[in-house]
Each structure stands twice: as C-alpha cells, then as structure tokens.
Amino acid sequence: MAEFSDPPPSNLSSSHKLTKPNQTLDESSPTAPIRDLVTNSLSLSSPIRQIQALSPAKPDGSSSSPPDKTLNFNPEENRDVNPDESSSSPSDKTLIAPPAQISPVSNNNHLRITNTSDSYLYRPPRRYIEYESDDDELNKMEPTKPLQLSWWYPRIEPTGVGAGLYNSGNTCFIASVLQCFTHTVPLIDSLRSFMYGNPCNCGNEKFCVMQALRDHIELALRSSGYGINIDRFRDNLTYFSSDFMINHQEDAHEFLQSFLDKLERCCLDPKNQLGSVSSQDLNIVDNVFGGGLMSTLCCCNCNSVSNTFEPSLGWSLEIEDVNTLWKALESFTCVEKLEDQLTCDNCKEKVTKEKQLRFDKLPPVATFHLKRFTNDGVTMEKIFDHIEFPLELDLSPFMSSNHDPEVSTRYHLYAFVEHIGIRATFGHYSSYVRSAPETWHNFDDSKVTRISEERVLSRPAYILFYAREGTPWFSSTFEQLKTVFEATPLHFSPVSVLDNSYESVDNSSKACNDSVGVSIPDVKWPDSCCQEPKEEVFHSAESSNNEDSSAMIDALGSPQSEKPFAETSQQTEPESCPTENKAYIDKSEKPFAETSQPKEPKPFADRASIDAPLLKVQNQDISPKRKAGERATLGGPKLKYQKPNSHQKRQGTFQIQRAHLQTKKQEESRKTKRPLFRSNVAASAPDPKYKNHALSYLNRAQTPRARKLANALSDSPTKKKKSSNMRRSIKL
C-alpha cells in the first residue's frame, strides 16, 4: 500500500527517475508492455493540468531526503526524453510522466512518493490543484446576486386599467366583452347613479345582471395589476341564452347582445314605482348604447316616401368586398332596390321600392360588429381580410335629415374585440382598451400588457367600441375613483364577490341585488352573519380627509353622501336570521358614533323573555355573601353564609347509585312505571298478528334497544341469551 507524506525540502534532480532500492521495472518481463500502457492511459485521462509544489525548495538546493526517491518534473528536459531509454544503471528503470499532461508552474516544483509495496502514481489533494479556463470571459463573469426575499409580497403597482380576468374554461368571449364594459366611462357613471327597485325585474332571484356587473367593475378597478375570476358569469351562462353551453366557445357578439338585453330588463320596472321618472330615463342600456336608424322606403311608381324609426343597440356591417370601416358604412347606408313587388299604400299597386338606412339617433357609445362569419346554411366560413378602422370617426355623411345638429357626430375609438381562429366556435378572443389618447393595453385573459398604436391598428377587429367626442377618457375617471377607493377600503375579499359563498348570501335574502352590509369601516363580517339592509361602504374622499371617523360613519349612513356605486333604493330588513343572533351593545362604550338608536336592553330578571343575549349584563344581582355583609353594615340581622358543597356538582358512583335506588323505590311505591322510550314506540300493536311478527323480528337482534322494544311489546320480558347459547347456535 502506498503511503503519502509531505515532501521535505530537497534539491532538484535532473535524472527524472523514480528510483526504488528494492523494486525495478523489468522490460523483459511479459507484463512490462501492459504496465507501460496502463501508466500512459492513467496519465492521459488525468484532468490535472498544473501541480503546485507542496513546499518550496531551499535556496541552496540542499535536501534532507535522499534524491533517489524523488520524482522531479521539468518540461524543458522531459520534452526530449524517450520512455524507452534506460539510465546508466541497468537495475534502475525510469518512469517518465507525459509532459503534455503534467506541466509544473516553475522549476522548483517537485513531488515525493514513498512506496513500500509497489509503484503508485500520486494524485495531489484538490486544494493544491489550480484550474485555468480557456475562456477568459467566463472568468470575468460576476457571480449571481442572491434573491432579496422579504416577509411581504412585493407591491404590484396599478397598471392604470382594470384587472385581468382568469380563463376558467372557454370564457375568453365573456372576458373580452366584460373588459370593454369595464372601461366604458358612460356605463360606469350610469351604474354609479342608477336607482333600481328591490327585487329587480331580471327574472332570476339567484342572479342579477345589474348587481353582478356593478360588483365586477368595482372589483376590477380596485384590483388593477392583479387577476380576478368571472365564474359567476360562467355559471349563469344559460341565463343569458338557452343556446349557450358552459365550457363551450360561444360567439362574443351574441353574448354582447344577450347581456345588454338582460341588463335592460333589470333596468325596466313594470310597476313604475317611481312615477315621476319615465321608464326611458331609467334604462341605462338605452342611455349608453341605444341608437336608432331611419328606414326610408320610396315607391318607384308614385315617388311616395315612408319613414320608419328602428331602435338598435349596435350595428352589424357587411365586410365582403370592402377593406375599410368607412366603405362598410357606405355599403350599409346605400340605396337598395327591393324586387319583391311590394304593394304601395299610395298608388295601391305592386311596385318596386327603394330602401335606404340612415343614422337618426347616435348613442354616447356606438358599437359596430364586423360580420366576419358567413353562413350558407350548411357551413360557416370566416373572412380573414384586414379591415382598416380609424381612431377618429365622423358619421355626419350617414345621418338622416331629422338628426339634431347640436349632437356631435364625431367619435373616438376606445376599445375593440378581436377573434383569432378559423371558426366562431373555435379560436380565442382578446380585447384592446385605449385608456388615454396614446395609451393602449391588450387584455388576453389574465395577462395585461402595454401595446403600441401601430400594432393595434394591424389587429383583426371583430367588435368596435366608439365613444362620442367629449367623453372623458378612462384614465381620468380611474384617477377619480382611485382616490375614492383609497379613502374607502374594500369590505369584502376579491374572491368572495364572485364565488358561490357570495351567491348563497344573495339567495338567503330572496333578493338578487342584496349583499352583506356593514356600518363600521375596516370591519370584515362573515358571510354567516345576519342579513342587514345594505349599507353602502363608499363615501366621498373629501369627507374622509377633513372629518374624523365618526363623521365618516355618519356620512355612510346618509343617502346624500357621494358613493362610487351608490344604492339609493329603500330596502326593508329581511327576516333571514333568527333574533337570537342579534346583540345589543352598551352605547356608552362604543368608540364610533351610531347611525341608528339601539333598543333599550331589558332588565336581567326578564332575561328569559328578551329576544337576544346581552353583551353586557346590567342590573345584575349581587352575590349572597355581599348581600349578607351589606345587611350587617346597615344593622339588619346578620345571615350566616354557607358555602355550597362543591361535591354536589360532581357526584361519585355511590351517590349516583343511591339516588337511582331512591327514585326507583319511589316509583314502585306509587305503582307507576316510567316508560323506557317514547310512547308512540311503546304503544302495543292493535293486531296481535302484527305484534307477534314484531316480537319475532326484534328477538333476532341482540342489541339493548331491541330487547327494550321487545319488552315493551310483550307482557313477559325476553331473556338475554347466554354467550354459550350464542356459540352453540353459530356452530349449528
């Protein structure tokens, strides 16, 4: 076995020999070539390129160890040495390491091997090995900086637009339409100031489109920079249309029309409880998206003209053989001949008529649907042609003569929906929103990215949203709402707004537009709390900055306070929870001002008759010991206070058995038998046939309850089988 030791200082030798006094390598032996081959292979496979000296040699070149046991490496001399050459002494053979594999740093490097058994190639420890990389750039690379983790999640700055919407299974067509609604400023203003009855006229007690849209827009604006779920709309997809199927791709324009139809139904009140306001003023859908067309029919025989007004919530444009939105509008409003030989009301003859459509009423928000899908009754194909759409659109050339000249006809593009795919039922929908004149964002499900205007104009638009000139940009509206949101924190978690727990709260109140109300800021109430009349959780930012907390609560209670999404309808408290869950709090200890006067708690003596448990006991009787002391102080007869026996509450086994025997003895003396169970079970069967059948059935079971039932039904109690009988019956 080879032994390694640190080399002592020694002189360098130029013999390059591994000298051993007792062992030599005999070239004449049959194993000599194999030994040379193994030695060369080991040296060639070694990854060592440089070896540092374990200890430097002395300056004078002397060494305390014999030179015949030292292997010195010199690249200048090893380069000319042949391994086949032998030394001057035939008994001393030389083993030379290949210079291409081992090269010393200096001429003073040496390595000493002390061997007692056989020859061994020495591999120095790794701490004395230096590696040089051929690539200098790797040596200049800086080490990776460690991650700086904190105890809190990094703060995500708002993006200036609404939150992204998670795709929970083919919901991209819902998300794209909701993103356009979220960034429609006239719709946001209408939802904030709209008053609707309770319950609404949506036709569904479990789901209200109006309330769901208000909650979604509010949550999306509060969660800017994050992502939220839209499962509430997905789960109620069949409510919008019976043709829709959950987890299936549907057409975005069809969903848009169905959504506006259901939203308009929530706005209309058939009873017209607010008699001073007309139903047209209550319809926020018509106020935001409602437009109208003037259809003109001209008789080619007598030139008589008839005009018809056609209301609409958007317009669908044919895009075949056109490449711009302007040409599609020209094709939409051009004169069309009807060859159906219609009967003229004036000349009473079947004639050919000409029809022309013109815009008569322009809404604050105009939507244009580009018909990219054509259906021939068998197959549906998509038109992939790029349609150019302008950022600014003037509709004055397409207006009717009855149009009000004071109403502006200029519009600005602020959002649109695109479809990527070959069919309407396949592919993917995404939306683009223009929050400022030069700021565009792409909403691809939960991913929200900033995008350039040039890239926006090159996208294949499917539904275009134009806002009338003079409408505030979304960025300014978002800054105003952001100030209000910072002053009024959200009182419910983002997940609970759209999940099933929130829907269960709506179901409990039997009103689709109710939610859990709170009256104190920064207090989170559980979903299982009593359903109170909805208190609005928002107030104006001015009052929150200048008034104290009590004034903020008063502002919340007042209906005149400014709120982002105000509830102004009068609602009565539903009886959705028992009165035992209510509690009265002492008014003197409340830190905030109350908006309503609580009921006066009843005395403690009448506690059995009150409706709810008291949080603070009032008029409580003093203890008997204190009462006895007061009597002695006032000169009355001093009563001796006897401490109650604590063992009475925890009786032992003997006391329990004694009480049981006394009770049993009293019952026997009174000749009364206490029933072992309910009387309806213990009643005997009227028919003895059924009685015997019941006894035979009960005797099968070997449970205490079965034996009690059998004893009650029969005059003679049945005896319990012994264990031996049970074993015998089993063997049989």
From Swiss-Prot:
GO terms for biological process: DNA repair; protein deubiquitination; proteolysis. Residues 11-31, 38-53 have a biased composition (Polar residues). Residues 55-69, 540-551 have a biased composition (Low complexity). Residues 583-609 have a biased composition (Basic and acidic residues). Residues 719-732 have a biased composition (Basic residues). The gene is UBP21. It catalyses: Thiol-dependent hydrolysis of ester, thioester, amide, peptide and isopeptide bonds formed by the C-terminal Gly of ubiquitin (a 76-residue protein attached to proteins as an intracellular targeting signal). It comes from Arabidopsis thaliana (Mouse-ear cress). It holds the Pfam family UCH. This is Ubiquitin carboxyl-terminal hydrolase 21. Its EC number is 3.4.19.12. Keywords: Hydrolase, Protease, Thiol protease, Ubl conjugation pathway. The active site is at residues 172, 428. Belongs to the peptidase C19 family.
